[in-house]
Each structure stands twice: as structure tokens, then as C-alpha cells.
């Protein structure tokens, strides 16, 4: 009997200061900010677990001890003495990631578990090792996002700058360790990898088919809680 394929690891980006969520983040790290009593990072992990994720790795910097204490050793955490940004944070944690490819998830965005299964569709969409798959959301389904859009998605599911349907990057990417082979040591943004994949026509997208919440500031937190309480 063929051995079932294990769901990829999930890398959780959890190192930022969360300045726009002050005063809440003056005493707790941003991933532990509660939304209707549930910490943001737990909401993100819940949507991944619903699709089969079992192994999570996070980076931490600001109030890292609180994040470690919250999970009591149940979450693998790579502590950053200095902020490494999104790309540098993932690269530093690569030795802790077992699967290849793996998911990278922001810890300030989520949707309701069971409302859609986008991670599984992202896995099915990735056809070559060179591809990076982004989770995208239509602007009309987004809460807490100030800009009109990030990218466009053409009829074939390819991500472009300006041709196709406007979409927002929903804070989830599926990529491989080889994408980091020629990246710098130290801080850098994941945008470095996305720009390269876009230039090489290796950036593709999957559209989330349910409301999406971005809790980036106190206003977005209040609006998200209002919607979820309705």
C-alpha cells in the first residue's frame, strides 16, 4: 500500500512588533492579540489544521518568551536576535522545516475554518518546483485591507502586475527551499522571491472563496470582531 503523503509544514511569521496594534501590543506580541478571545496565531493554525497540517514552525523576536510560554513547547520556534523581515525569517528557520515544499502564513490574517479548503487547492496548483503559489482574495471579500489590490490574476491563474482580475495577497504562500538558494544572509523581504517568480512567470495564484480578515491595526480588529459577532 502506498504511504499517504504528509501535509506540508507551516511556517508562521510571528516576529514583528505589531506597532499598529498598540496599545494592545505594548504588553503582548501581535500573534497573541485576541480576536473574540482567540489569539490571532491560533486562528491561523486552526485553518491550517482543518486541512491536515500537523507541524508548525514560527519565528519570534518581540516578546518571544510570551509566545514560547503560550504554547508550552508544542510549537517549534526560531528566535531571532534581530528582526530578519519576512524572507530572512523564513530562511533562518529552514533547518527546522522538514517538508519541501512548505507553506508560509502571516499570523495577522485568517478565514473561518471549514469555509474553504484553499491550502489543498494550492498544493494541487503547484505543477513545478520553480513555481510559487500565492493565496489571493478578491477585494470585495476582504476586511482590514486599505489598498485596492496587490496583483492581478489572469484567466489561467498566473499572477501579473496589471493584467487580469485585481486580487489581494491573502498572506499565504507555498514555496520550496530552493527558492532561498541565492538569497542574502540577514534581513530581506519575501517580495524578493515573489518578484523573481513573477519575472520568470512562475508566480501563480489560488483564490480564496470565503471572507478574509486582515487584523493589521486596531480599526481592523474592531471591524473583524463586529462582523464575526453578527
Where are the regions a protein language model picked out?
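Conserved N-terminal catalytic core of the sugar/cofactor nucleotidyltransferase
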Residues: 1-12, 20, 34-112, 116-117, ...
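Cofactor-binding loop segments of dinucleotide-utilizing enzymes, especially the Rossmann-like FAD-
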Residues: 15, 61, 107, 137, ...
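Acidic-glycine-rich active-site phosphate/pyrophosphate-binding loop
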Residues: 16, 70, 146-156
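Short alpha-helical oligomerization interface
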Residues: 26-30
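Conserved beta-strand segments of alpha/beta enzyme cores
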Residues: 31, 74-76, 202-204
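Short beta-strand-to-loop element that shapes/binds the nucleotide-sugar donor at the catalytic cleft/hinge
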Residues: 62, 133-150
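Catalytic-core segments of class I nucleotidyltransferases/pyrophosphorylases
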Residues: 103, 110, 114-127, 139-143, ...
Amino acid at each position: 500500500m502506498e504511504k499517504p503523503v504528509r501535509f506540508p509544514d507551516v511556517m508562521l511569521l510571528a516576529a514583528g512588533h505589531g506597532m499598529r496594534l498598540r496599545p494592545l501590543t505594548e504588553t503582548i506580541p501581535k500573534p497573541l492579540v485576541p480576536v473574540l478571545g482567540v489569539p490571532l496565531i491560533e486562528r491561523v493554525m486552526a485553518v491550517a489544521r482543518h486541512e491536515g497540517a500537523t507541524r508548525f514552525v514560527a519565528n519570534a523576536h518581540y516578546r518571544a518568551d510570551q509566545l514560547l510560554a503560550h504554547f508550552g513547547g508544542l510549537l517549534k520556534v526560531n528566535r531571532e536576535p534581530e528582526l530578519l523581515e519576512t524572507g530572512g525569517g523564513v530562511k533562518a528557520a529552514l533547518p527546522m522545516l522538514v517538508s519541501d515544499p512548505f507553506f508560509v502564513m502571516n499570523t495577522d490574517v485568517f478565514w473561518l475554518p471549514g469555509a474553504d479548503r484553499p491550502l489543498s487547492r494550492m498544493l494541487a496548483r503547484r505543477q513545478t518546483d520553480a513555481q510559487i503559489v500565492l493565496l489571493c482574495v478578491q477585494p470585495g471579500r476582504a476586511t482590514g485591507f486599505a489598498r485596492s489590490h496587490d496583483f492581478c490574476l489572469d484567466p489561467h491563474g498566473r499572477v501579473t502586475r496589471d493584467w487580469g482580475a485585481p486580487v489581494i495577497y491573502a498572506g499565504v504562500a507555498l514555496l520550496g527551499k530552493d527558492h532561498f538558494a541565492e538569497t542574502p544572509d540577514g534581513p530581506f523581504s519575501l517580495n524578493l522571491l515573489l518578484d523573481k517568480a513573477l519575472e520568470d512567470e512562475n508566480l501563480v495564484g489560488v483564490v480564496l472563496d470565503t471572507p478574509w480578515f486582515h487584523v493589521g491595526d486596531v480599526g481592523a480588529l474592531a471591524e473583524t470582531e463586529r462582523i464575526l459577532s453578527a
